[in-house]
Amino acid sequence: MALMILPLIGSVSVSETLVAMITVCMIYMLMKFLHPDVPEAPPAPGPQALPIIGNVWSWENGLPEPHGHGQRYGDILQIQIGMRSVVVLSGHETVRQALIKQGHDLRPPDLYSFQFINDGKSLAFSTDQAGVWSPPKAGHECPALLFHARGHHAAVLLHVGGACLQGGRLPRQAAVQRHGTDASFDPFRHIVVSVANVICGMCFGRRYGHEDQELLSLVNLTDEFGKVVGSGNLADFIPLLRFLPNATMKRFMAINERFMTFVQKIVTEHYNTYDKDNIRDITDSLIDHCEDRKLDENSNIQMSDEKIVGIVNDLFGAGFDTVSTALSWSVMYLVAHPEIQERLHQEIKDKVGLSRSPVLTDRHNLPILEAFIFEIFRHSSFLPFTIPHCATKDTSLDGYFIPKDTCVFINQWQINHDPELWKEPSTFNPDRFLSADASELNKLAGEKVMLFGMGKRRCIGEMVARNEVFLFLAILVQRLTFHAVPGEPLDMTPEYGLTMKHKRCHLRATVRTTE
């Protein structure tokens, strides 16, 4: 056979043959390095899908129920949403393996709707992180941490004080309601507006009156965004729908455009009034950071001016909805468990007193309150799933094959209710996070609670959210006692959306004495 081929290729020397063989081997080794073989593994199990629509028909709002098929199929479940394969991950160790040990295999998915969030420049939703931060390690430094770390302590204290100020409004409102014709009121509205005001102060350096139309417009816009995103967008999974009339998608695009216009206006104002020696808020801090890096060509962290708008927008959205939802659930749990409410008040009375407002430095002295917050996060799991991820390459996890571009959902609800992690997970019990004598917080147990994701793509607003929830809740428990309205049952059934919220309701609040 070789002799038959030789006339076709001509005479070949031994050295040329060796060079050719070495070249072929090097190319083969390079291809193996760039495209390593994924160990042969079966696809993840899952329910039978229908053509085109997949498994969407079996879920409310087009989203998988957080407590659904996992018990039947295990920690790795494959489903079909429209025409796209989706893997749902459950189990603490499985999720830890995926997000931390194999975190480089995942990124935000290239979903159609994501390009309209922050004009495609969102830190949380963009598939291209290179334009925000250059190297992978620096790529996930939280801008809020940057704000704190750069020495802008006066501005930080100002906004911590703002949380105290806004937290104190609800007790005053309760006092007004108590002397009115109707002793009940909707605490959710006051919580949302107060939280929005603190976030505005931290991000934009401005605060509003609670009836200010610009503030209320922002609150309503954020509420609309949550409802639209929570209802799902099938155009992300059935491409044909992108070319058909879609009222939900039009509404989604309009909401994002209004957000961008608002933030762009504020960022422009900040550039015009920027003073390097007077950093007022996170926007100023990011501008300062951007200006410094422009002068340093060798900097590890690079950020364009236009990215500032997207980052500030992300921080506002992440901090606002998470905090307001956490606080509203907290009030509901206080009403549902009056004995815990009294226990929390007694701890604050003993450790902080009633003559001043609690501050962040009180946290280490209030382990019962910290445990209560952990249990709120765990039991309500109001963020049942993280922001979707996507496989960057063919990979395998726990013996199952996950093809490149597979969308990956992380089931936080299951982790927070896993009977292998938690004793009686359906029971609300803050003591699970305390030492036997309730004098210390069990930090190891707290680390198992999953609400803000895990690994390099943790929620960028986590630090802001935790601090605000602590301050607001400490002030409310110190100054108020919450009660259900007689004759009206307390309905804590969650309503699914971007975050799971309880049904709006009226409660009663009594102002506590300062003695």
UniProtKB/Swiss-Prot annotation:
Signals that turn on the gene: By benzo[a]pyrene (B[A]P) and beta-naphthoflavone (beta-NF).
Broad enzyme group: oxidoreductase
Cellular localisation: Endoplasmic reticulum membrane; Microsome membrane
Catalysis: reaction(s): an organic molecule + reduced [NADPH--hemoprotein reductase] + O2 = an alcohol + oxidized [NADPH--hemoprotein reductase] + H2O + H(+)
List of residues binding heme: 459
Keywords: Endoplasmic reticulum, Heme, Iron, Membrane, Metal-binding, Microsome, Monooxygenase, Oxidoreductase
Domain of life: Eukaryota
Cofactor(s) it depends on: heme
InterPro entries tied to this protein: Cyt_P450, Cyt_P450_CS, Cyt_P450_E_grp-I, Cyt_P450_E_grp-I_CYP1, Cyt_P450_sf
Gene3D superfamilies in UniProt: Cytochrome P450 (1.10.630.10)
One cellular component term from this protein's GO annotations in UniProt: endoplasmic reticulum membrane
Main location: endoplasmic reticulum
SS bond list: none
Known role: Cytochromes P450 are a group of heme-thiolate monooxygenases. They oxidize a variety of structurally unrelated compounds, including steroids, fatty acids, and xenobiotics.
Stored PANTHER family: CYTOCHROME P450 1A, STEROID 17-ALPHA-HYDROXYLASE/17,20 LYASE
Similarity comment: Belongs to the cytochrome P450 family.
Protein name: Cytochrome P450 1A1
Organism lineage: Eukaryota, Metazoa, Chordata, Craniata, Vertebrata
Gene this protein is translated from: cyp1a1
